[in-house]
């Protein structure tokens, strides 16, 4: 329940005491840190990957925090600073973020969540924070003044902050604006009272912040022994995120407790994908409808009240004030008023309606615990037993094990709603309790596919119904509101086609498939494009050059592919100009063979001509090689790049940012700059033979420290379509050891 400003101030005072106790516990525990440090050994291999071996799980968590801080200390501390709502105070950026963190009491609620965790996992979170602090204390004089020691509450607050932005999102606000119009500004008729400090519908993320990317997600598949040369399952996964998200690899070993190799993101205290000697899994983003926006009818007789179940209820207001650093370095305050109903915080408001947001995501405080428990499981039954606890609020899970099982599980903390045909994707009626949910679906009620006859499962962020073309999951057996996505996009279509196209795969076949630069979109529309160009009477020089470039292009975005730059420019402008660009739209009866063709040949010709002129002007030729324009760049390394957005139907997903010279870069635009780019970065392939074999690649290296050789030592492998072996067994680690030490 929202509080008045006075009560909020009181809660802040109470929290300060709680935070003081948390910090005091670290101070009192300082004498124990050296003991934990002596209980853990970090062995860095020749790619800088830490293999953390500890006597206890608590010591292992301490070592994980320390090793992460060695590689990404500033990034971790900046994330936690933002989650505290203090970004603007120190940097002058992120004011909207800080307002939202204060609105949602992020630090206070995270401290409470920490106390609610099971005792053992609470110790692990605190130990991870202690490991980060150990590094900070050792390097205090070398770190900026804004770097602060952290608490276990900070670790949880970072996760919660991400969920807050998902729930109170600019994307939702924009969709409501499209449907209901831009709301009145303060002082205009219909605006709420007491808005001199602003109002909640102004909020969201900073204008400079990136919107949620439609390509965010991953590729994943698992092959059963019936579809592999070795007769054993193979698991492949590669997430797609911005390269500044900083995937990070490690192995955590506590004899008799855990021995897991995998990846996570900087600032996260557990590994979220990978394998142990028994099993492995990877995740891809799904689209569960975990959040509802309730349209509340405002009471015309009573300002700032709404009608619910026939009664008038007040909207409660909360004034949020943050500190922000001005350009001249001076501190200033920023104040904004937000509103809340009994159904949730008001994300948007019009003269007649207020829109309250309610979600399962924000309070999923056992998220990290869920992944940690999964990493300790030894077989399918144990894995499913952990999943049934429903600790992880989202994600498709693609699983394989040494016993020969493969499993796809569409996972979510999904509300149990009235399945009466209501479209829950944006706003739902909020005038009664009819659509207000209380309970969640059990995991056993969600879509899954275990050991299909086809011998494979795949997910490239597609709806669960298309996990296998030969073993479809029937959507009619599940509530209609489970999955927001309806269509099968081109990226999962090419995955299905490639998997279906080979009877059996070796591990080398799987590696080659991962790095294919084939573009499915080109195969679907290029025949129509060439036909339209060749039908032009008295063709211009641009059309002739376009025909030659498109006709000879290999339909790939390999570094040496000529014509791909031209085609991309053509498609981007054509599809932006034509609302329905395909001659045959996507058809659920032909989910992996549509869409196809071009709906408007005249527009296609016009946009191709303009694309020829554009590529000539910018690059000198319509047939410039893809790798002459697209670069993988880190420090002094500058290599031809390949890959493109998955929206073109690519399995090799890489997106680039433009530098000042017109080149497109994934990596660093200038030396020592933060990474840019998006898509393939971490790739893992696991074959469940005895002994287990695994390979991976981390495009931008294990460390963001520019002076570290491990900040760029894998980009050449990545550009060359190679994976490096994962050293999982003790003998292999020792044979490839760079250094060994205690924190």
Where are these regions (language model features)?
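Bacterial N-terminal signal peptides that target proteins for export
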Residues: 1-13
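Bacterial N-terminal signal peptides
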Residues: 11-21
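Boundary at the C-terminal end of the N-terminal hydrophobic targeting segment
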Residues: 27-29
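Substrate-recognition/specificity elements adjacent to catalytic centers across diverse enzyme folds
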Residues: 31-246, 255-257, 262-264, 270, ...
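Second-shell loop/turn segments in exported
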Residues: 60-63, 109-123, 358, 368-374, ...
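Glycine- and hydrophobic-rich flexible loops that cap the catalytic core of alpha/beta enzyme folds
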Residues: 257, 261-266, 270, 274-279, ...
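Hydrophobic alpha-helical segments
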Residues: 392-502, 574
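Terminal end segments
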Residues: 471-539, 628-743
């Amino acid at each position: 329940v929202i509080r008045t400003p006075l009560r909020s101030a009181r809660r802040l005072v109470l929290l300060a005491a709680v935070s003081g106790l948390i910090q005091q516990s670290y101070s009192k525990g300082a004498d124990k840190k050296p003991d934990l440090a002596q209980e853990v050994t970090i062995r860095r291999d020749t790619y800088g990957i830490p293999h953390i071996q500890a006597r206890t799980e608590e010591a292992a968590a301490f070592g994980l925090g320390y090793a992460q801080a060695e590689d990404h200390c500033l990034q971790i501390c900046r994330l936690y600073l933002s989650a505290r709502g203090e970004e603007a105070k120190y940097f002058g950026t992120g004011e909207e973020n800080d307002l939202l963190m204060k609105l949602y009491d992020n630090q206070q609620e995270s401290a409470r969540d920490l106390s609610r965790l099971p005792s053992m996992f609470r110790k692990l979170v605190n130990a991870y924070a202690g490991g980060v602090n150990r590094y900070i204390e050792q390097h205090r004089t070398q770190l900026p003044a804004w770097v602060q020691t952290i608490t276990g509450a900070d670790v949880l607050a970072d996760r919660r902050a991400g969920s807050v932005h998902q729930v109170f999102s600019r994307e939702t606000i924009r969709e409501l604006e499209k449907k209901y119009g831009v709301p009145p500004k303060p002082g205009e008729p219909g605006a709420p009272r007491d808005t001199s400090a602003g109002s909640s519908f102004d909020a969201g993320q900073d204008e400079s912040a990136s919107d949620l990317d439609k390509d965010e997600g991953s590729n994943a598949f698992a092959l059963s022994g019936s579809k592999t040369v070795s007769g054993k399952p193979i698991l492949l996964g590669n997430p797609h995120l911005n390269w500044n998200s900083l995937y990070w690899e490690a192995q955590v070993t506590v004899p008799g407790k855990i021995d897991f190799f995998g990846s996570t993101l900087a600032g996260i205290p557990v590994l979220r994908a990978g394998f142990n000697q028994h099993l492995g899994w990877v995740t891809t983003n799904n689209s569960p409808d975990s959040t509802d926006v309730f349209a509340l009818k405002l009471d015309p007789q009573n300002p700032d009240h709404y009608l619910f179940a026939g009664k008038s209820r007040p909207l409660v207001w909360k004034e949020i004030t943050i500190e922000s650093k001005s350009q001249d370095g001076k501190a200033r305050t920023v104040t904004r008023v937000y509103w809340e109903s009994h159904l949730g915080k008001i994300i948007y408001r019009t003269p007649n309606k207020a829109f309250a947001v309610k979600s399962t995501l924000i309070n999923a405080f056992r998220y990290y615990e869920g992944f940690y428990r999964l990493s300790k499981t030894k077989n399918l039954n144990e894995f499913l037993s952990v999943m049934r606890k429903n600790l992880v609020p989202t994600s498709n899970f693609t699983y394989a094990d040494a016993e020969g099982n493969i499993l796809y599980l569409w996972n979510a903390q999904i509300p149990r709603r009235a399945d009466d045909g209501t479209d829950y994707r944006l706003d739902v009626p909020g005038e009664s309790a009819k659509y207000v949910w209380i309970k969640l679906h059990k995991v056993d009620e969600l879509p899954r596919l275990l050991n299909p006859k086809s011998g494979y499962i795949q997910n490239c962020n597609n709806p669960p119904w298309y996990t296998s073309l030969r073993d479809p999951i029937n959507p009619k057996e599940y509530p209609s509101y489970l999955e927001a996505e309806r269509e099968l996009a081109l990226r999962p279509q090419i995955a299905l086609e490639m998997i279906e196209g080979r009877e059996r795969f070796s591990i080398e076949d799987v590696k080659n498939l991962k790095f294919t630069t084939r573009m499915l979109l080109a195969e679907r529309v290029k025949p129509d494009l060439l036909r339209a160009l060749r039908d032009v009477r008295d063709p211009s020089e641009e059309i002739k050059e376009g025909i030659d470039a498109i006709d000879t292009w290999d339909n790939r975005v390999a570094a040496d592919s000529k014509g791909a730059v031209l085609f991309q420019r053509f498609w981007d402008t054509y599809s932006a100009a034509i609302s329905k660009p395909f001659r045959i739209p996507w058809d659920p009866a032909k989910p992996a063979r549509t869409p196809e063709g071009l709906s408007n040949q005249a527009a296609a010709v016009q946009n191709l001509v303009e694309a020829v002129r554009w590529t000539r002007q910018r690059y000198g030729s319509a047939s410039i090689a893809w790798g002459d324009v697209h670069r993988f760049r880190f420090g002094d390394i500058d290599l031809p790049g390949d890959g493109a957005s998955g929206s073109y139907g690519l399995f090799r997903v890489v997106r680039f940012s433009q530098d000042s010279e017109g080149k497109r870069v994934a990596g660093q635009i200038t030396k020592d700059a933060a990474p840019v780019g998006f898509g393939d970065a971490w790739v893992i392939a696991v074959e469940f033979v005895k002994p287990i074999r695994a390979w991976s690649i981390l495009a931008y290296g294990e460390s963001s420290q520019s002076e570290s050789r491990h900040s760029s030592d894998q980009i050449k492998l990545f550009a060359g379509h190679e994976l490096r072996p994962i050293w999982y067994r003790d003998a292999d680690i020792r044979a490839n050891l760079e250094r060994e030490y205690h924190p």
